[in-house]
């Protein structure tokens, strides 16, 4: 097997142990207090609840790999009724000998195009770039969509810039000053990922840091400039090549939107929305 990197975060570990200790202590002290027990015993995050109907706008997909031994693809959607971001994920373990060789951009592209979801057996490649109507769909507390075959999916149009008018009125998507809180909070539950829609016509100030193994770039539309970055990895190889191409002098300048993950100190690109389509440029 391939050797795995192991990362240890003392603060996260201490927080988990502290929460376990404090919760167990309070449970033992309040065995007859039903109200307190209800607050202490948190519902399972993986529980999914069924909703009769919902309308979604695809925002692209990107590949990922964890240090704990998993890899996969996550597609992002804007849930119109709740004005929130939802995800649909396809994943598998890469610590088995027969799956390690699949962790390449080429094989993940096949996974993006071939694996099917929901009643109409649509692929992530198609779902992530389309407007959808879902019936009897399942969603959990972390805004993750279930791949249940009981869900009925009706695909309407390809997503283009013209579909973003409503999304751009949502502060969480258009206001870049709204970022995830980087300060530690014992009582804060894990929050869903935050996305941004960044307008740009071209990229500038592209540089690759050999020391950090990270690409830095600026998204500009002639009026505003927004900085982003992307760490190098085998899965990000195609994306970095695409971003470098967009920074070349000969690249046509036209209106686009970069869908980005918000981080406290940077923006990480996911996909590009143009006047004609969504470009899942990692694949």
For every predicted segment, state its role:
Residues 1-283:
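Helix-loop junction hotspots and adjacent acidic micro-motifs that serve as functional foci
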């Amino acid at each position: 097997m391939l050797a795995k990197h192991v990362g240890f975060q003392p603060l996260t570990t201490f927080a988990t142990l502290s929460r376990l200790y404090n919760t167990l202590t309070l449970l033992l002290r309040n065995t007859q207090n039903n109200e307190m027990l209800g607050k202490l015993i948190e519902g399972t995050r993986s529980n999914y609840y069924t909703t009769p109907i919902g309308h979604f706008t695809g925002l692209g997909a990107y590949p990922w790999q964890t240090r704990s031994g998993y890899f996969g693809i996550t597609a992002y959607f804007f849930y119109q009724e709740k004005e929130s971001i939802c995800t649909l994920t396809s994943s598998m373990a890469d610590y088995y000998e027969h799956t390690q060789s699949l962790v390449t951009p080429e094989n993940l592209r096949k996974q993006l195009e071939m694996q099917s979801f929901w009643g109409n057996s649509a692929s992530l490649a198609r779902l992530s770039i389309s407007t959808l109507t879902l019936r009897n769909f399942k969603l959990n507390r972390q805004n993750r969509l279930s791949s249940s075959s009981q869900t009925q999916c009706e695909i309407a149009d390809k997503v283009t810039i013209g579909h973003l008018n409503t999304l751009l009125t949502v502060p969480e998507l258009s206001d870049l000053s709204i970022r995830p809180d980087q300060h530690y909070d014992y009582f804060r539950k894990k929050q869903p990922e935050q996305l941004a829609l960044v307008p740009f016509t071209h990229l500038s100030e592209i540089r690759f840091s050999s020391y950090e193994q990270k690409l830095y770039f600026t998204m500009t539309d002639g009026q505003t400039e927004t900085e982003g970055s992307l760490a190098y990895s085998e899965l990000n190889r195609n994306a970095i090549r695409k971003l470098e191409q967009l920074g070349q002098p000969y690249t046509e300048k036209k209106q686009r939107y970069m869908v980005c993950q918000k981080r406290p100190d940077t923006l990480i690109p996911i996909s590009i929305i143009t006047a004609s389509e969504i470009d899942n440029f990692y694949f």
